[in-house]
Amino acid sequence: MLSCGVDFDIFEISLKDKPKKMIEISPKGTVPVFVYKNLVLDESIDIMNWATEQKNNNFIKINPHDWALIKSMIKINDGEFKNKLDQYKYTSNKEASLKTKYRKECEIYIKNIDERLEKQEYLLSNKFGYLDMAIFPFIRQFFNVDLKWFEEASYINLKNWVERISGSDLFIK
């Protein structure tokens, strides 16, 4: 929204105690929910697509040649990786061997992202873009499951990428 100059409000939502108004707006009951005039979007990717389509979007420009790769990486991220990430996140720490198994399954994806970042600062180039925006929240969820492990892991490129994005003006705002 910042990239296209749309004013917005962010509300912290407890998923255990969802506000009635949120459910009225989006019966699906998941976050995020974006409301603009008569438009309601309740999928992150739909919100991102809407933002990139705005005339005054001065931030995220997508090279048409990158679309196939973007779609492929997002499909893997939102499918296979997200499923493994949920297993990793929601497995009790008491089940250490199972938690480690799920983390290692996530690492197959994480390693690919880290290797991709050997060549440039961001996923498609040296400039933050659409793909970074789409994938970053999931990578952040992954490392927040066990921050100590992530800090000690050998994914230097990924750690630098996370730090660059986390410290950027866009993220801080």
Language model features with spans:
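GST-like domain detector, emphasizing the conserved glutathione-binding G-site
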Residues: 2-108, 112-114
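GST-like fold's C-terminal all-alpha helical module
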Residues: 73, 77-167
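Secondary-structure junction/capping motif
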Residues: 42-43, 129-130, 173
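Membrane-interfacial terminal anchoring regions of lipid-handling membrane enzymes
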Residues: 2, 123-126, 173
